[in-house]
């Protein structure tokens, strides 16, 4: 409870209601006016990130300060599970930071550009809203944030951060249980 009070004293929290489930890209687009066309961090709440040392977003902010552009936290996943995630293709990097040269949402088996998956932590530039405003649907008939990022990649730099830590996908029963053990 002390943590909640400390955060409440220093933060302003707002929410936007997505009236229809049209995809993550649509949910982000719904927040456009709240973000006021500024760079922003997007943290998906169904992914719990347990880091060693510095938090995941803090690691990402360090990369943002050094490189600017768009930053995505990634983690390696076994090849058999890649079809369930957004996957990035990367160039030469320096340990835990890599330039992104491609992305694909839920690739078919054997077509993923790497084993690095997007884990639900992003720092994005506001031009993403221009792309999302077209409301083009992608995988599953939804407005996908990954599809919008692929288009933005044509004009802006993206970097992947292989954060130090572990994630729990609380959107699955097993992930939720593991997060609570």
Where are the regions that the model predicts?
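Short beta-strand segments
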Residues: 17, 42-44, 73-76, 162-163
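Short, conserved clusters of charged catalytic residues that mark active-site
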Residues: 26, 55, 144
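Hydrophobic helix-cap positions at the C-terminus of alpha-helices
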Residues: 34, 63-64, 152
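Conserved alpha/beta core of the MobA/IspD/sugar-nucleotide pyrophosphorylase nucleotidyltransferase superfamily
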Residues: 37-39, 90, 96-101, 113-181
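Conserved core of the sugar-phosphate nucleotidyltransferase
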Residues: 48-130, 135
């Amino acid at each position: 409870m002390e943590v909640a009070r400390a955060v409440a004293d220093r933060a302003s929290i707002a929410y936007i209601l997505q009236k229809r489930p049209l995809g993550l890209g649509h949910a982000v687009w719904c927040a456009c006016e709240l973000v006021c066309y500024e760079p922003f961090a997007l943290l998906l709440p169904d992914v719990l990130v347990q880091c060693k040392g510095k938090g995941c977003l803090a690691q990402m902010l360090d990369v943002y300060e050094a490189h600017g552009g768009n930053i995505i936290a990634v983690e390696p996943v076994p090849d058999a599970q890649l079809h369930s995630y957004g996957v990035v293709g990367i160039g030469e990097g320096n340990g835990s930071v890599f330039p992104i040269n491609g992305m694909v949402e839920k690739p078919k088996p054997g077509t993923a550009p790497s084993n690095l998956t997007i884990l639900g932590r992003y720092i994005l530039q506001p031009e993403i809203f221009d792309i999302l405003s077209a409301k083009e649907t992608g995988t599953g008939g939804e407005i996908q944030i990954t599809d919008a990022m692929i288009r933005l990649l044509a004009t802006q730099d993206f970097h992947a951060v292989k954060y130090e830590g572990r994630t729990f996908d609380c959107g699955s029963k097993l992930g939720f249980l593991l997060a609570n053990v």
